[in-house]
């Protein structure tokens, strides 16, 4: 068995879709030299950002779905946009017919999930410092709350956005603090405060 992943399929040239149509319809593809590849034991995944944005009356890009929208409403809007793209924009409804109902609309990261992702990333940093540098790090409630507020401020960038928050407000300032204070191992450190408004962000530790 094998898995094929085609990322952001809407960016492919329309002629490429003819190849996919052959695969989805016949389960095989033959090249110009008569070589045939069979896909009977292959899972094919297409990813797409279709439906996230739409064109406004003035032609500018507008958000079609938002992170505060209920999942059911968001799913309906995305599916409608995908259908319109294949039927109206491309004029290729047969491709959509081959895909059928096998469309999974991923939800935005909701606040309760974002908190879990944040905790997982922070815990990993603490474990790595302990195991690799023998540096024991903990965060005060206030410091952790600062991270949480930053992570929840804008969830439109998903897990990557949360990772950027952790990097900008914890990893980088912590690395600077350890270097400036010549802490290279066998130490215990408590982060009392994250000064998020400083440029760059700084830590107060004890």
Model-derived features: positions:
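AAA+ P-loop NTPase nucleotide-binding core of proteostasis motors
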Residues: 1-206
